[in-house]
Amino acid sequence: VDRFYRHDPTSTGPEIMAWCEWQYYKNYGDKDRLRKVYYPLLSFHHWLKNYHRWKDGSYWSSGWGCGMDNLPRCDLELIPDSEDWQLETFHHSYMSWIDATLQAAMSCEYLIMMAEELGITDDVDALRDEYDNLIRFVNEKMWSEKDGFYYDLKADGSFLAVKTVAAFWALIAKIAPPD
């Protein structure tokens, strides 16, 4: 059953709408629509940046929030009062989430392309800086050279050593180094 509760972080889905709208624009060339959606998408990005981002710049989500609630990525031992099995699906587990972080980077990239297409210059530098910082963070902190894989990070900076499909967002975002 889908659910929505105001101010509940599990009620916020993944940040993929800028990507979707850019694909729509590339297929149909509807610049009026692009102009209408740009600022709401930018506002959503800023909202997530303010409320779903850790101090190191990485992003978090939850099982329901990321849409992949069946992944074994939440460590119940890190969650206070975790006797409730549902917390595994609903809690962010104090982690930096690889998919949420890469989706934020992709959103920056697509918002930049939209802004350039629309002749908007105000936000481009800040978005480009965030994009560069996120990509650097992901490749420096979330990549395991030993395993050749991207991982979520625990609060202490160590890898959550569970391989999940969330790492494949690095391929979708086209940020994985060629080697």
What residues fall within each predicted segment?
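Catalytic cores of carbohydrate-active enzymes
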Residues: K49-C66, Q103-D179
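Short, conserved alpha-helical segments within structured domains
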Residues: G13, V37, L127-E130
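Generic beta-strand or strand-like secondary-structure segments
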Residues: I16-Q23, P40, W47
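Active-site acid/base region of carbohydrate-active enzymes
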Residues: Y28-I98, N133, W143-K146
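TPR repeat positional signature
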Residues: P14, A18-E21, T101, C108
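Solvent-exposed loop and edge beta-strand segments that line ligand/cofactor-binding
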Residues: V1-P14, Q86-L102, Y151-L171
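Hydrophobic/aromatic side-chain positions at a characteristic register within alpha-helices
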Residues: K26-G29, E116
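Flexible, glycine- and charge-enriched loops at secondary-structure boundaries
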Residues: T10, L34, V124
